[in-house]
Amino acid sequence: MLDRFRTAQAGSIARLRRLAEEGQLPAPWNFSEINARPGFAAALRTAGAPAVIAEYKRASPSRGVINLDLTPADVARMYAENGAACFSVLTEAAHFQGDLRFLTQMAFAGRPMLRKDFLLDPLQVVETAATPASALLLIMRMFADAQAVREMLDACRLYGLEAVCEVFDEADLDLARAAGAEIIQVNNRDLDTLATDLGVSRRLAARKEEGELWISASGLD
């Protein structure tokens, strides 16, 4: 499954490289001095445990279209009214019918937003910075080595974004730490097999280190 997601990124990355060559990459989102890009990790820490990251996903490969009756704005309003600390927004188009514009449509709710996609190239960090997102997802299994992850983390710091490094097992966790990850998200659903096991979070949590912010994702009702 991850190979399919990786292949689907080729067109987006090629488009961004053409824009870079032409000097036409999008400018960073223009926040006002008063209303700066909200802190993702800070919001989770302030909310305390358990802090909820509420996800907006229009469709999925396994379920197809989930809901077309509610707009991204409708969902953002309901999530905010019910106490979500942050939003996670699927922007991948080919398999999840996502769109970067969802981030703009949900920003009014004032919650820090995580761009959830299958990002591989630092130019996609630049693209994310042109939206009101506060953070982006980096899936460790998408990267060949720690240096590739480190390049993405460096780009995030340069553009004022936070990186959520997603892991499925001990090897992924070792890779994230070797690259300098500060926010670790344990996905209980293995994207290679789509099997869900809440025991993954319980097992890996034993390796949490001081100063790290950890998130458990998938399979939680």
Which residues fall in each region the model found?
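Structured beta->alpha junctions
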Residues: 91, 117, 218-220
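Glycine-rich phosphate-binding active-site loops on the catalytic face of alpha/beta enzymes
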Residues: 85, 89, 130-145, 185-194
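Generic beta-sheet signal
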Residues: 116, 139, 166, 186-187, ...
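Catalytic alpha/beta core domains of metabolic enzymes, predominantly
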Residues: 198-201, 205, 212-221
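Conserved N-terminal beta1-alpha1 strand-loop-helix module at the mouth
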Residues: 1-113, 120-123, 155, 160-183, ...
